[in-house]
Swiss-Prot record:
Superkingdom assignment: Eukaryota
Protein name per Swiss-Prot or TrEMBL: Zinc finger and BTB domain-containing protein 45
SUPFAM superfamilies: beta-beta-alpha zinc fingers, POZ domain
Source organism (scientific name): Mus musculus
Pfam short name (any one): zf-C2H2
Compartments where found: Nucleus
Zn finger (C2H2-type) start-end: 412-434, 440-462, 468-490, 495-517
Compositionally biased tracts (Acidic residues): 206-225
PANTHER family on file: AGAP004733-PA, ZINC FINGER AND BTB DOMAIN CONTAINING 45
Family affiliation: Belongs to the krueppel C2H2-type zinc-finger protein family.
Listed GO MF terms: sequence-specific double-stranded DNA binding; zinc ion binding
UniProt keyword list: DNA-binding, Metal-binding, Neurogenesis, Nucleus, Repeat, Transcription, Transcription regulation, Zinc, Zinc-finger
Amino acid sequence: MAATEAVHHIHLQNFSRSLLETLNGQRLGGHFCDVTVRIREASLRAHRCVLAAGSPFFQDKLLLGHSEIRVPPVVPAQTVRQLVEFLYSGSLVVAQGEALQVLTAASVLRIQTVIDECTQIIARARVPNTPAPAPLPPPVPPPLAPAQLRHRLRHLLAARPPGHPNAAHSRKQRQPARLQLPAPPAPIKAEGPDAEPALTAAPEDRGEEDDDEETDEETDAEEGEGGGGGPGEGQAPPAFPDCAGGFLTTAADSAREDPPASTGITDYGGAGRDFLRGTGVTEDVFPDSYVSAWHEESSGGPESCPVETSAPPDCALAGPRPTGVKTPGPPVALFPFHLGAPGPPAPTPPTPSGPAPAPPPTFYPTLQPDAAPSAQLGETQAVPAAPAAQATAISGTPVRAPGGQGAEQPAYECSHCRKTFSSRKNYTKHMFIHSGEKPHQCAVCWRSFSLRDYLLKHMVTHTGVRAFQCAVCAKRFTQKSSLNVHMRTHRPERAPCPACGKVFSHRALLERHLAAHPAP
């Protein structure tokens, strides 16, 4: 019987990667490229086997025998070029502002891995960072009576064994945490000769002050407060940071006095001595008036605690606007990702009581003063327009309002339905309704649209990005209209049915219910 022949397995770790790198080098050199990808006016050469393996869009085109593939012009050519390079290299660098364009291009080419990654990038960027739950404050023990305080301190001071002067700093015999005090930091004087001393803020107050953006003068004042640390200028902060708002600040002025006479209590060195000095220790560690001063510490005067003033209102919403200046609208994006409920509307600019100011310079040609008024501009009297002005208005030229009252707004009139528009962009969009032209086509389902904006909104149905979130229940939707319908469920007012008592969130739903309701 013949011996079993040995079998050797040869496995190269990075063979696939090196093969793609070789193909990418051939593509850059223009060797063996058998397909052309065109996007707008740009074009690039590639290998059909790589494109078909990485993109179902290219695979469907190549199965039909196309040697030249034209990508729908919904995204820039540079974005498509990046995705083609991704098919060769497997790596893609996406900036935060370009994630939406890359997502749209990947949806057209149906590259699912890029769609998933860009969806996560957009979701992380659009969702507001939920603040971490604030840590629970440490339990504050109930205030003790003066006699109990004296007994507690005597017990702590007597816990030190005799004959060990440095036992408080020993690692084997540790004293309570409040008696192991580090050396006080070097005093830092407040900046400037006119800086007023103030008490050191508590750690939690210091954290709240750091969250607010203040001016340079206020920042310098906070640095002075952090360095001052005591009631006097240039004085070292108290040795007990946990007791900064407690009993040490009530008798900090007595820290400069001489040490009291010995009362039989074991003398401590270093921080322990400063601790006993700062509280003015006698035979009774704390006087009877100590408790009232402790409780009144939180209700300090306006000089001891700086009062934070609220930030001034936004300059875009405060004060009247000059006549003729339009309120800036929301930022325009490829997909309008507006999370939560919409913001408050901008206030209406007040009408000036004096004479109307001169209208701002316009870039539209001056027309006859008796031009036909627009129904959407708010005029009540109609002045007969000249034939030349009517012909100009029908052709889409701006029409001015009669008279010189207020700012002159241009208007465009549709020659088919006589509808007027205040901007050329809206007028151009409206003309697609009458022409029936739909030049923008979805590369996934081949549905056509008259405007590129409609195509971009339609692409959300393929990408699955739920960019619109309810501010009440955090539910997400793909379209703004779906969010608006959902917001009706959170309205406090309800429309009850008089017959069966069923409530509805909208009166239209109630009317539909009443129409289908059986007659009594």
